[in-house]
Amino acid sequence: MKTILVVDDEFDILTVWRLLLERHGYAVRTASNGAAALELVRSSRPGIVVSDCMMPVMSGLQLCAALYEDPELRDIPIILCSAASDIPVQPNPHIAYARKPLSFDRLLAMLVRMGG
């Protein structure tokens, strides 16, 4: 079973995506900001990270940079989501970008494409 870490500061998004992903056979962990996500990744490496871009404490961009700086974590696939029309491109080749609002069907398709 593939483990997905969903990172978003909106509780409703965390709850809905967790429930839907679990119904599709995924194990799901959640975090409300990049700093909490980084702790979870270091304690239990997920198969894929799905992260919002703009969050308090540590943004999704900062999370992506921190993961890329760690040689043991840099190959974790990441789906970085944002309502903004332009997200600064990260040097990590394992990042896919998604525009919010992101439908669950599109999320599932992206997960499958990224090996989830």
PLM region spans:
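Active-site beta3 strand of CheY-like receiver
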Residues: 44-50
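Receiver (REC) domain active-site loop signature in two-component systems and cognate sites
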Residues: 55
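C-terminal output helix
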Residues: 102-115
